[in-house]
UniProtKB/Swiss-Prot annotation:
Keyword Nucleotide-binding: no
Organism of provenance: Mus musculus
Residues recorded with modification Phosphotyrosine: 277
Protein name: E3 ubiquitin/ISG15 ligase TRIM25
Zn-finger region bounds: RING-type: 13-54
N6-acetyllysine PTM positions: 272, 572
Pathway named in the protein's UniProt entry: Protein modification; protein ubiquitination
Protein keywords: Acetylation, Antiviral defense, Coiled coil, Cytoplasm, Immunity, Innate immunity, Isopeptide bond, Ligase, Metal-binding, Nucleus, Phosphoprotein, Transferase, Ubl conjugation, Ubl conjugation pathway, Zinc, Zinc-finger
Membrane spanning residue stretches: none
One Pfam assignment: PRY
Length: 634
């Protein structure tokens, strides 16, 4: 099992790289074989150092056998022996000297093949010339080995003696005279050293083979996970595509329903006009027939016949044509249009919110490395509408608008607070209600906005439309409720508690509680008109309902050739300007509203610094005939 391999590394001595044999623990917390650490410190001498972390000990620590580590090593060895091998692979055996050796010539006759090498005579002999080593007592103590090709390699270059020992500490073969220089080492015979190293290498091969198998399985696992990710994302993309298809279907159904209602309204009004037309045609035909009969009688010369027919026609009377007042149901049309506008606003807001979350997610690091991640289809409307419900002001009339994939909003209620637009990076962050910005920060933010270009201001652009429920009866609204002017006659709007009754004013449909918002108004024949903002609680009746003449409204006003800024019935005369477009920047978070004169560039007209306490509405005043205020599109 591959999971045992990391444990084998943890249970290996860092000196001999083998499993612990009688493990001991140093005061610094590292484990070694007792023999390995003892030999290391004997060679090293004081001061003593830990072979792993190199911590210095002036006095050699007393080492005790780590019984817990011994038990762990024993359990590991038992698990290694008991576990079923992954495969039947075993390390290849090392070839013996006899099988590995090639044919060596006899050093005596140089023709026959040697059968033995004498390590004392330092020569190889064939069977014939080897006989003295068996027959003569003088050669009986000479050690014989299988034929060795290069005997010179076995000789010590320093002492010219045969190297018959191996020093594991220095990793080299030595002769008996070299032992003087290796007093602290633990030399062994070549056969013993060869057997030990062969055992270690066989273990190393086993571990390497296991590691290679582990790497192979890891590669397969990575490929498998890669395929799982690909399959999972394919499914998720298909689900996402299905969600968007359903949303498109909902929008298509809403469009079809809205167009059908408009068609029905058109058919209703058109049918009434058609009926009236048929009645008028019939009435006209009757009047033309009567006219022809009268003209015919007038041509009669016979008085008796004239009197007889004239008396009969005298009883037939005609009445002037009357056309009953027939008009489209503007409330219905406005409701349908506002429903579509609300739907578009909800979608834009949800998409921006989703993009913002995605940017924040990418900025904080990629957390999607897990193969099995939670996937939730995008359904932006529910949370957004819930926010809109909580942001509705108490003075705002009308029902709240709802949006869901299955139901189209029927009408955007006046007073719905629009969520603030995302600000640009150079703008100051939002101020919380619990911790208002300091005066210095507010002043810095205000100064920052006073130096912005029109292009930068348009980053905060919001679409404003007039709320016909607030329009005075002398104010005429047109162009999809984006143009206001003074009408010649009363508009006969239906009664509404939010409607202005004293001043010819109108408010924007939506209010703003937080964030930064910018809109522009085009003035045609800019005389006797005003542009500003107000609380929803501003009076609707009496002189105090006039824009700027109360503590709940702020405006810039054109009166004849004079331009003034008004608030709480206090007037501030402003320099005249030829600009016909006014830009209004409202910063709810930092408490100020700025009025700009917009030409090719923007120029400051006036600014109010206020700690706003309620939701704010765009507000407009028109008084002079011919004066028109038009909300500009971006």
């Amino acid at each position: 099992m591959a999971e045992l391999n990391p444990l084998a590394e943890e249970l290996s001595c860092s000196v001999c790289l083998e499993l612990f044999k009688e493990p001991v623990t140093t005061p610094c917390g590292h484990n070694f074989c007792m023999s390995c650490l003892d030999e290391t410190w004997v060679v090293q001498g004081p001061p003593y150092r830990c072979p792993q972390c190199r911590k210095v000990y002036q006095v050699r620590p007393q080492l005790q056998k780590n019984t817990v580590m011994c038990a762990v090593v024993e359990q590991f060895l038992q698990a290694e022996q008991a576990r079923t091998p992954v495969d039947d692979w075993t390390p290849p055996a090392r070839f013996s000297a006899s099988s590995a050796a090639t044919q060596v010539a006899c050093d005596h006759c140089l023709t026959e093949i040697a059968v033995k090498t004498c390590l004392v005579c330092m020569a190889s002999f064939c069977q014939e010339h080897l006989r003295p080593h068996f027959d003569s007592p003088a050669f009986q103590d000479h050690p014989l080995q299988s034929p060795i090709r290069d005997l010179l390699r076995r000789k010590c270059t320093q002492h010219n003696r045969l190297r018959e020992l191996f020093c594991p500490e220095h990793g080299e073969c030595i002769c008996h005279i070299c032992l003087v220089e290796h007093k602290t080492c633990s030399p062994t015979t070549l056969s013993q050293a060869s057997a030990d190293l062969e055992y270690k290498l066989r273990n190393k091969l086993t571990i390497m083979h296991s590691h290679i198998n582990g790497a192979t399985k890891a590669l397969e696992d990575v490929r498998s996970k890669q395929q799982c990710v690909q399959d999972s994302m394919k499914r998720k993309m298909e689900q996402l595509r299905q969600e968007y298809m359903e949303m498109k279907a909902v929008i298509d159904a809403a469009e079809t329903s809205s167009l059908r209602k408009l068609k029905e309204e058109e058919k209703r009004v058109y049918g009434k006009f058609d009926t009236i037309y048929q009645v008028l045609v019939k009435k006209k035909s009757e009047m033309q027939k009567l006219k022809a009969e009268v003209e015919l009688i007038m041509d009669k010369g016979d008085e008796f016949e004239f009197l007889e027919k004239a008396a009969k026609l005298q009883g037939e009377s005609t009445k002037p044509v009357y056309i009953p007042k027939i008009d489209l149901d503007h409330d219905l049309i406005m409701g349908i249009y506002q429903g579509a506008a609300d739907l578009k606003s909800e979608l834009k807001h949800s998409i921006k919110k989703l993009q913002k979350k995605s940017e924040e997610h990418n900025g904080s690091g990629n957390k999607g490395d897990q193969t099995q991640s939670t996937f939730k289809p995008v359904q932006p409307s529910k949370k957004t509408i819930q926010e809109k419900k909580t942001k509705k002001t108490p003075v705002a009339p009308g029902p709240p608008s709802h949006f869901s994939p299955n139901k189209l909003p029927t009408f955007g209620a006046p007073g719905q607070s629009l969520d603030s637009k995302a600000t640009s990076p150079d703008a100051a962050p939002k101020a919380s209600a619990a911790q208002p910005d300091s005066v210095g920060v507010k002043a810095k933010v205000l100064e920052n906005f006073l130096t912005k270009s029109r292009t930068e201001l348009l980053e905060y652009f919001v679409k404003v439309i007039f709320d016909y429920n607030t329009a005075h009866n002398k104010v005429s609204l047109s162009n999809k409720y984006t143009t206001a002017s003074v009408s010649d006659g009363l508009q006969h709007y239906r009664s509404h508690p939010q409607r202005f009754t004293y001043c010819s004013q109108v408010l924007g449909l939506h209010c703003y509680k937080n964030g930064i918002h910018y809109w522009e108004v085009e003035l045609q024949k800019n005389n006797f008109c005003g542009v500003g903002i107000c609380y929803g609680s501003m009076e609707r009746q009496g002189p105090e309902s006039r824009l700027g003449r109360n503590p709940n409204s702020w405006c810039v006003e054109w009166f004849n050739n004079k331009i003034s800024a008004w608030h709480n019935n206090v007037e501030k005369t402003l320099p005249s300007t030829k600009a016909t477009r006014v830009g209004v920047l409202l910063n709810c978070d930092h408490g100020f509203v700025i009025f700009f004169a917009v030409t090719e560039k923007v120029h400051l007209m006036y600014k109010f610094k206020v700690d706003f306490t309620e939701a704010l509405y765009p507000a407009f005043w028109v008084f002079s005939a011919g004066t028109t205020l038009s909300i500009c599109s971006k």
